[in-house]
C-alpha cells in the first residue's frame, strides 16, 4: 500500500486513513480475513513515520495482517521505522526493494546494511532489471520485449549501447557456466548475501521453472562474483 488509490486527501502515502482503508478494500476484494504480510510501499514527506507505524500497529493488533514489511525505504528511513515499530511491538520482518546486478541502490543508500544489522529480511524485486538480464536480450532488444520501442522505459532502467555490451558479456559468462542469464542474475542475488528471497515475474510456467533452476546451479566463486561486478561497473 502507498500508491494512489483515489483523488483527494489521504489517497496516497502512509497516513492511518489511507493504510487502513487500503487494506480493508484489499481484504474485501480477496475475500480474506487477513494477509500474512502487509507492505507499506510509498512514503510521502507530509506523513510522519510515527503515524505510519501507528497505523501498522492497529492493523496487526486487529488481526488484519500477521506481519508487516517496508518497501522502497532507504537505510536511514528503515532505521527510524524499525525503532518506531519496535516501540509499538509491531512485527516488522521484511524489506522489499529493487535490486539486481545493474541496480545497487540498496547498497548505496545503506538499506541492505541496515536490514542486516537489524536482522530483517530483504526481498529483491526486479531481479532481471526489467528483462535486461535474460537470454532474450543477449543480442539486442527484440520485438515483444518490454524495452522494444519504449524509450521512456529504456531510460528509466538505464538501457544503452554500453548496457547492451554488459548484457552480452554476462550472457557469455552464463553460457560458459551452463546456465541462462536469468539464472545467473538470480543466483548472484541469493549468493551475494543479505537477500532473503527474490521476487520474479513470469509469463509462463516454463519461465518459472527455468528461473527456479537457479537454485540448482553450482555456486559462484569469489572470482566469478568479482567478474560480474566488474562487468556491471560496480
Predicted segments with their positions:
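Active-site groove signature of glycoside hydrolases
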Residues: 27-46
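Active-site mouth loops of central-metabolism enzymes
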Residues: 3-20, 41-47
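Beta/alpha (TIM)-barrel catalytic core signal, keyed to glycine-rich beta->alpha loops juxtaposed to Asp/Glu
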Residues: 43-233
Amino acid at each position: 500500500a502507498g500508491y494512489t488509490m483515489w483523488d483527494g486527501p489521504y489517497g496516497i502515502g502512509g497516513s492511518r486513513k489511507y493504510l487502513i482503508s487500503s487494506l480493508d478494500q484489499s481484504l474485501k476484494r480477496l475475500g480474506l480475513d487477513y494477509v500474512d504480510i502487509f507492505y507499506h510501499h510509498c512514503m510521502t514527506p507530509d506523513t510522519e513515520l510515527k503515524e505510519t507505524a501507528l497505523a501498522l500497529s492497529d492493523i496487526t493488533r486487529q488481526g488484519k495482517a500477521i506481519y508487516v514489511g517496508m518497501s522502497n525505504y532507504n537505510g536511514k528511513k528503515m532505521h527510524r521505522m524499525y525503532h518506531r515499530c519496535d516501540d509499538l511491538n509491531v512485527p516488522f520482518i521484511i524489506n522489499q526493494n529493487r535490486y539486481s546486478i545493474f541496480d545497487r541502490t540498496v547498497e548505496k543508500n545503506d538499506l541492505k546494511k541496515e536490514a542486516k544489522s537489524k536482522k530483517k529480511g530483504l526481498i529483491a524485486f526486479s531481479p532481471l532489471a526489467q528483462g535486461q538480464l535474460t537470454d532474450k536480450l543477449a543480442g539486442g532488444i527484440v520485438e515483444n520485449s518490454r524495452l522494444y520501442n519504449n524509450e521512456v522505459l529504456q531510460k528509466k532502467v538505464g538501457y544503452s549501447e554500453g548496457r547492451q555490451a554488459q548484457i552480452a558479456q554476462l550472457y557469455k559468462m552464463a553460457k560458459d557456466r551452463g546456465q541462462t542469464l536469468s539464472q545467473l542474475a538470480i543466483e548472484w542475488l541469493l549468493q551475494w548475501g543479505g537477500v532473503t528471497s527474490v521476487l520474479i515475474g513470469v509469463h509462463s510456467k516454463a519461465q518459472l521453472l527455468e528461473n527456479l533452476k537457479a537454485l540448482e546451479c553450482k555456486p559462484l566463486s569469489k572470482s566469478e562474483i568479482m567478474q560480474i561486478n566488474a562487468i556491471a561497473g560496480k
